[in-house]
C-alpha cells in the first residue's frame, strides 16, 4: 500500500500528471493484455488485433503527445530520404528555442518517460526470447512487432534528444546510427503508410 501511495505522490509532482499517467498506462496496458488477454479473448485473431491496436495507440500517444509534453521532444520520419546530418528523422526540440520562457522539463516527467520508453522494447524482447524457448511462433510474431514498434519510438526520441540544432551538419553527422537503406523500396514503403498518419499528429 505504501508503494502505491508513493507512486501516486510521484505522479502528483509531475507537471502533467494526466499525460504522464496516460503515457505509463499506454506502456502497461499492451503488456498486461498480452499476459492476461488470453483468459478473456478466445480467438487468436482477435487477440492479435486487439494487442496491435493497443500498441498503435501507445505509439501515437508517446510520439505525438507525451513526448512533446513531458520532455519537449518530437520526431517524425523523413519520407523524402535522409537529412544533411545523416538522420532519417525530422526533429522538434526545446533546444531550438533558447529564448523560451516557459516551464522547464520536470525531472520526474523526464525520468519516468525515459525509463518507460526504454523498458518497453526491452520487456518485449524478453517476451520474444521466452516465445522462442517455448516454440510459440504466433506469439513470437506479435512480440517482434511490439518490440520493433516500441524500439523504433525509443530510437526516434533518443536521436531527437541527442540532436544539436545549432551545430553544423558536419559536426553532428557522426552521432547518428545509420538506418539501413535499400534501392527500389517504394513499394515496401507503401506498406507502412501508417507512418504518414502518425506524422501529422
From Swiss-Prot:
Q: Does the keyword section mention Glycoprotein?
A: yes
* Glycosites: 64, 78
Query: Where does the record place it?
Result: Golgi apparatus membrane
- What GO biological process term is on the record, naming one? vesicle-mediated transport
Q: Per the record, GO CC terms? A: Golgi membrane
* Transmembrane residue ranges: 18-37, 43-61, 112-132, 137-157
Disulfide bond sites? none
Keyword field: Glycoprotein, Golgi apparatus, Membrane, Transmembrane, Transmembrane helix
Q: How does it sit in the membrane?
A: Multi-pass membrane protein
Which Pfam family is one of those matched by this entry?
Answer: DUF846
Q: Its biological function? A: Golgi membrane protein involved in vesicular trafficking.
Similarity comment: Belongs to the TVP23 family.
In Swiss-Prot or TrEMBL terms, this protein is called: Golgi apparatus membrane protein TVP23
Q: Which gene encodes it?
A: TVP23
